[in-house]
Amino acid sequence: MPRRAQTARKEKYAPALSRTTDKIVVKLMMNGKKGLAERILRQALARAEASARRPGLEVLDAALRNATPIIEVKPRRVGGATYQVPVEIRGDRRMSLGVRWLVQAARKRTGKSMSEKLAGELVDAMNGIGAAVKRREDTHKMAEANRAFSHFKW
């Protein structure tokens, strides 16, 4: 029996954003080190807050909005040819693609620590620049270029 009183668990983030932050933590996590991934995210949000002069979660929300794709192309075989058919993305896949692209872009950056790289990518994505936003723009351009094949949707 413990002699000390049990402490209540504290919520780290607002409930609405906790799903988003949890997804980012899972994408950041390597070798099961969830505590380290959470610390990286917390530090990145603090750095982003300092550089953008806006609350960290607001920066994260804006960055995700700018990096999240709405439409993508999927290959569809018709006759002997394969066409890239533009398809609208479901909400959950949209979110996971945005998070994945942000984390991948942050990992590719050159910098000191992962929290610095992630903070830089978040601020860039919030401002509409950066690798994750560029990837979204490329995806949308590809869908726009293949709009003629949209009648092949299944």
Regions found by a protein language model. Give the residues of each.
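Strongly charged
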Residues: 1-31, 35-38, 42-154
